[in-house]
Swiss-Prot record:
Classification via Gene3D superfamilies: Putative methyltransferase TM0872, insert domain, Vaccinia Virus protein VP39
Chain sites annotated for binding S-adenosyl-L-methionine: 33-35, 52, 78, 99, 106
Sequence similarity: Belongs to the methyltransferase superfamily. RsmH family.
Localisation: Cytoplasm
One GO molecular-function entry: rRNA (cytosine-N4-)-methyltransferase activity
GO biological process: rRNA base methylation
Organism: Phytoplasma australiense
Chain's gene name: rsmH
Entries under InterPro entries matching the protein: RsmH, SAM-dep_MeTrfase_MraW_recog, SAM-dependent_MTases_sf
Descriptive protein name: Ribosomal RNA small subunit methyltransferase H
Reported function: Specifically methylates the N4 position of cytidine in position 1402 (C1402) of 16S rRNA.
Catalyses which reaction(s): cytidine(1402) in 16S rRNA + S-adenosyl-L-methionine = N(4)-methylcytidine(1402) in 16S rRNA + S-adenosyl-L-homocysteine + H(+)
GO CC annotation terms, alphabetical: cytoplasm
Keyword field: Cytoplasm, Methyltransferase, rRNA processing, S-adenosyl-L-methionine, Transferase
Length: 303
């Protein structure tokens, strides 16, 4: 079944961005443009830069935009934030939004290999310009490397067994070739047998966790004082990175016996405004099942 992509936690994200109508903003994950259009609706003399590494997403949204709207779409990975903005003489932002979820359109594209529900070549690249594909990983990575990817990125308990069977059954070309292997171990398991393996491969293909760390660091440098950063994540690995980054930059740690009074502490870079992650309402989860795992964290630049 094909689902229309619905932006998750859209109202909450816009609220936490606290948009200045004349400010400069980045939507780091354009996708199908839901959050981008919401930000645009709050701008007057401001400007928005929307990033996406998926050329199709950029092209699809570009066709729908009024040429007079204050927006530029940038076909690039969000790990290139500073580089791409510097090309445009932009060195400070009033706010930045990350929606880390894969779009429904990408999942439902039967030729891109993101879904275990479609028989497609094992590709999984967000950006077709890059060389590494999921097919190369399953056919050429060593047992140890496959096992580690499945264990770390997929949190898969049977990582070693699945990796061993993949090597035994090489070459694998399609998503159904891979599903046939995971079904050996989870035939009667609740949920799909390949879910964690597909997640792990997608993360490895696109280096999702590494580029997220890079983009968060760059965001902190780019934000003005009182600028907002909002991140929506969809699995524990992403959320853990965001949580750690916010915490690390919102406190100062000194040796316990150092004679410094609390009033002398330098101000931390960030002030966290979501003490606990914001999650979708029951109504949103019912209307959009893909929102169920979403968590939103937000912070404001202090200095």
């Amino acid at each position: 079944m094909t689902l229309r992509h619905i932006s998750v936690l859209k109202e909450e994200a816009i609220s936490f961005l606290n948009i200045n109508p004349n400010g400069v903003y980045v939507d780091a994950t354009l996708g199908q443009g839901g959050h981008t259009l919401s930000i645009l609706n709050h701008l007057q003399d401001g400007f928005l830069y929307s990033f996406d590494q998926d050329l199709k997403a950029c092209s699809d949204i570009q066709k729908k935009l009024n040429p007079n709207w204050p927006i530029e779409i940038i076909h690039s990975n969000f790990s290139n934030l500073k580089l791409e903005l510097a090309k445009r003489n932009v060195f400070q932002l009033d706010g930045i939004l990350f929606d880390l979820g894969i779009s429904s359109c990408q999942i439902d594209d039967s030729q891109r290999g993101f879904s275990y529900l479609h028989n497609a070549p094992l590709d999984m690249r967000f950006d077709n310009r890059q060389k590494l594909t999921a097919q190369e990983i399953v056919n050429f990575y060593s047992f140890e490397k496959l096992k580690n990817i499945f264990h770390i990125y997929g949190e898969e308990k049977k990582a070693a067994l699945i990796a061993k069977q993949i090597i035994k059954n090489r070459p694998l070309k399609t998503s159904y070739d891979l599903v046939a292997i995971t079904d050996m171990f989870y035939k009667y398991h609740k949920g799909h047998s390949a879910k964690k393996i597909f997640q792990a491969l997608r993360i490895e293909v696109n280096q999702e966790l590494e580029v997220l760390k890079q983009a968060l660091s760059q965001s902190l440098e780019l934000l003005k004082k009182d600028g907002s950063i909002v991140v929506i994540s969809f699995h524990s690995l992403e959320d853990r990175i965001v949580k750690h980054f916010f915490k690390k930059n919102s406190v100062f740690e000194f040796p316990k016996k150092l004679p410094i009074m609390s009033v002398d502490y330098p101000q931390p870079a960030l002030r966290i405004i979501t003490k606990k992650p914001c999650i979708p309402s029951e109504v949103e989860m019912k209307n959009n099942p893909r929102s169920i795992s979403a968590k939103l964290r937000a912070a404001v630049k202090n200095i």
